Amino acid sequence: MLIDEIVSKCDKRYSNLADCQCEDCPCETECSHDCKECLENVHFPDRTTIRREYDCVNMADCYYCKYSYRYASELIYGLRQFRDIKNRDILKVMSVGCGPCTELAAIDYMLSKGEIHYNKLEFVGIDPLKNVWGNIWDDIKDYLADDDRIFGQRYSGYY
């Protein structure tokens, strides 16, 4: 499945960084070499004096490993509520602030379980942070490259 493949690639990149993990880290103070801590600073800014945003590829890989299964499961629960998407000729999905495109992982899971069917999938993801999520987008494109049901993939920029 897509999610397992992307988690594996993100984990491999994140695990292989060792000492250079924070090479591109914009932390103003000494870095803890722990992207989970930086993610906490992003998600709970009131708990810290260090202002962080999604601004590091290492953090993006850590994020996908830590949160993708949880977020994909929430998307699956939500998508199951909409009967009209279960059998579509063209399934059109737009994600604003798509980040690592976890919607595609949820759709891939539902497709593999026979919960939805489509002949074509048009996915448009809008997110200005290509420099942060780009490795994951490339991994997704590689995974989906042989699937002729996918078209119209866009993951970056302002459309």
Features from the language model and the residues they span:
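S-adenosyl-L-methionine
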Residues: W133-Y159
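N-terminal auxiliary segments of SAM/dcSAM-dependent transferases
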Residues: M1-P45
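Conserved class I S-adenosyl-L-methionine
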Residues: D89-G99
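Conserved SAM-binding loop of SAM-dependent methyltransferases across substrates and taxa
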Residues: P100-H117
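Class I SAM-dependent methyltransferase Rossmann-like catalytic core
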Residues: T48-I85
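Active-site catalytic pocket residues across diverse enzymes, especially alpha/beta-hydrolases
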Residues: F82-R83, L111-E115, I140, L144
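Conserved SAM-binding motif I beta-strand of class I
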Residues: E122-D127
